[in-house]
Amino acid sequence: MDVIAKTYANGFFKSFMDSTGGNTAVFLLLAGVVISVVIGYFLGSLNFALILSGKLYKDDIRKYGSKNAGMTNMMRTYGSKAAGLTILGDMLKAVVSVVIGSFIMGHIFGGYAAAFGCVIGHVFPAYYGFKGGKGVATAAAAILMLDWRAFLIVLGVFVLSVVLTRYISLGSVLGAAIFPLITFYSYHQIDQGRVYSGGWFAFMVALLIALLVIVKHHENISRLAHGKENKFSFKKSKK
């Protein structure tokens, strides 16, 4: 168990990096990060909203509602069962991605890289014409695996926003926006203000994930600004 925990924390490539050093170590670091991103991307491309709407309903969720292949549109179109299965699948692929990435290149470099790849895969899936969802559930599960304390704060912001406004999109945007701020603060505190490559890498990945989720909500943000955004409801619109 100690060996597994150590490999998860540092990554399989770490032992080779320690024994080589120099340019070879840098190459192994970059290779591990790239491999983690690629694995995360292809796992993330498994879009469960599209899989379930196709298998269970012989349909394409992107034809209905917001045209988004995600949990909220599945809820509005097919109901809570379909939405629950969607969020479970979209979160599970993020969990698997982070675990694999961590074993490859350690929790910081591998885990965060795989998480980023998974969110990109969900938003731009290779298997579905690069037209996927907005990455909220996938990003949430990735955050949980990367830093459970950050997840609790992000979840709190999301839930409070949705309870007060009933706008899923607003809660998603606010939750995404606060994630890189929490990540920056966490590693700044751990490192006591010193430049720490792993911490800065984690912050940059968190920032990219947040920006990706927020940009994918640009239409929702526009509707919110004009008071035209749909509020969340448990009622489905399609029989």
Language-model-detected regions and their locations in the chain:
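Interfacial segments of multi-pass membrane proteins
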Residues: 75-78, 101-104, 117, 121, ...
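Short, non-helical or kinked segments that cap or interrupt transmembrane helices
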Residues: 59-70, 127-140, 167-178
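Short, strongly hydrophobic alpha-helical membrane anchors
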Residues: 1-29
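Cytosolic, membrane-interface loops and tails of multi-pass inner-membrane proteins
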Residues: 51-81, 222-239
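Multi-pass membrane catalytic core of lipid/isoprenoid biosynthesis enzymes
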Residues: 76-101
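N-terminal signal-anchor transmembrane alpha helix
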Residues: 31-56
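Transmembrane alpha-helix interface/packing and boundary motifs in multi-pass membrane proteins
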Residues: 39-45, 119-129, 161-168
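Hydrophobic alpha-helical transmembrane segments
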Residues: 30, 34-38, 84, 111-116, ...
